[in-house]
């Protein structure tokens, strides 16, 4: 896990989830965001006998980790959050080592054949031809979607108050991402994720459809 707020949040979440299965990590290894040599950390994982490694790190650290493990003959099942779910990017920078990695997902895969997704893809070609169509481009669409829906509900008489009221009226709104619900008290929106796996030729393989987090504290 990355030795910062992001990594530590992931570590704590992993601990809580494993505890529901009466399990715990056999190794918890911090790395600095800019660390370049992970030899000792990866050897520690290998020597521990860990069959699965959960990563909460940035793409560069993840790449170094996988390449290091390839040189020492260590092949665990890698699992990560949606932070590393851009399979096209990760496959390229790891030299193909990303195949088989399991991650969370923001929404539909960039290659999905869906009317709304196809519309967004064509719009991207027209209005942002210099940008690479992929998971994080699509994530921006997912994140902006509730605001677009609110603006549609407000109509021409736009104001801050009217927009906020429309946002707070959104219930189970879903397009290409998870269902989103906002209220005046709660703006978390959702805690649902999909689980996907990187297959051959950067194929997105759906392992688990939208699933809500039963441990989410914002609901309680």
Task: Mark where each language-model region is.
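Solvent-exposed, acidic/polar segments of extracytosolic/periplasmic ligand-binding ectodomains
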Residues: 115, 168-220
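Short, charged, surface-exposed loops that flank catalytic or proteolytic processing sites
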Residues: 152-165
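Extracellular/periplasmic Venus flytrap/periplasmic-binding protein
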Residues: 1-73, 111-118
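Short glycine/serine- and small hydrophobic-enriched flexible loop segments
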Residues: 67, 145-153
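Extracellular/periplasmic catalytic domains that process cell-envelope and extracellular macromolecules
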Residues: 46-48, 71-73, 93-97, 158, ...
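A structural signal for well-ordered alpha-helical segments within the folded catalytic domains
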Residues: 141-148, 161
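Conserved beta-strand scaffold positions in the cores of enzyme catalytic domains, especially
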Residues: 26-30, 101-103, 195
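Extracellular/periplasmic periplasmic-binding protein-like sensory domains
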Residues: 66-141, 211-215
């Amino acid at each position: 896990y990355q030795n910062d707020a992001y990594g530590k949040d992931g570590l704590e979440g992993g601990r809580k989830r494993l505890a529901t299965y009466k399990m715990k990590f056999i190794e918890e290894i911090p790395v600095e965001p800019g660390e370049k040599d992970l030899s000792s950390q990866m050897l520690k994982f290998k020597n521990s006998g860990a069959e699965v490694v959960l990563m909460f790190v940035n793409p560069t650290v993840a790449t170094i980790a996988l390449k290091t493990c390839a040189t020492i003959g260590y092949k665990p099942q890698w699992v990560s959050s949606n932070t590393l779910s851009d399979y096209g990017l990760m496959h390229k920078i790891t030299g193909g080592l990303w195949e088989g990695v399991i991650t969370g997902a923001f929404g539909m895969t960039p290659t999905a054949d869906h009317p709304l997704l196809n519309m967004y893809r064509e719009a991207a070609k027209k209005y942002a031809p210099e940008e690479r169509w992929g998971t994080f481009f699509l994530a921006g669409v997912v994140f902006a979607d509730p605001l677009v829906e609110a603006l549609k509900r407000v109509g021409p008489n736009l104001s801050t108050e009217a927009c906020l009221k429309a946002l707070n009226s959104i219930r189970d709104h879903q397009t290409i991402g998870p269902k989103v619900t906002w209220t005046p008290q709660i703006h978390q929106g959702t805690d649902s994720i999909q689980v996907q796996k990187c297959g051959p030729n950067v194929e997105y393989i759906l392992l688990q459809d939208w699933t809500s987090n039963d441990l989410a504290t914002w609901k309680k």
